[in-house]
Structures are given as structure tokens and as C-alpha cells.
Amino acid sequence: MTYDELKTRIADYLNRSDLGNVIDSFIDQAESEINRKLRHKDMIKRSTAVLDNQYSQLPGDWLGAINVDLQTGDPVPLFQKSLESLDLYRNSIQNTSGQPKYFAIDGDTLEVCPTPDQSYTIQMTYYAEIPALSSTAVS
């Protein structure tokens, strides 16, 4: 089914022909709701990044972490903490640098602790947003 066919079916289901302008908004809202609630194996993605400071940008389609590993020969898992717990831990080690052990998510940013003492490659396994439909991205 194409995007235009979906819009036609929605209008037919509602038995309204005057909703052409709001059906796009209806589809956007449905996609947002699906991305908030659905977690399916087909949404799982992997991404690597170089971690050389306390913060790293998350992928643009990030919904939630499954796991984050340092790629140092054998993968070394980083354990997720709340931002508050990460700050408390950072204070307890007097903000020393070292191999990261923990991570927290702050919006679109990954924060690690301790602050990396060198560049590390990390692999992030995460749930990704379902690509949005539009008149140009029809399936």
C-alpha cells in the first residue's frame, strides 16, 4: 500500500472527503504513538562511535538502549545508570578519567563515566524509530 492509498483508506473509513489536509497530521501522530510504544526485533539497530570525551551524540533515530559495549578485543559492557547516579559516581571517584564503566542518556546525548582516558570505540545496540511515511517516502 502506498502513502496515498493509506490516506484514501483513512478518508474512506471515516467516510469524509474533506479531511485531506489533516490526514497527514493524523498519520504523523499515529507514527509518533507507535514509536513511543512499540519495540520489535525489526527496530533493532547497531551503530559504532568513537568515544573520546564524556559526551557522545546518539544516532538520530535513537529510541532506547539495548546495550552499549566498549570494543576492546572482547566487548566490555557499559552499565546504564540514571544521570543522578552517574553524577554521584563521578563525584565519588573525584572526576578521574579511565576506561568507562557506566553510561546515562540525556536527551540525544550519551554520557559516560569515568571520562575516557583515551579514545574508545563503542558499539550501541538500540531500538530505532520506524522511518516516517510521506508523499516522497511511500513505504
Regions found by a protein language model. Name each.
Residues M1-S139:
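Glycine-enriched, solvent-exposed interface loops adjoining structured elements
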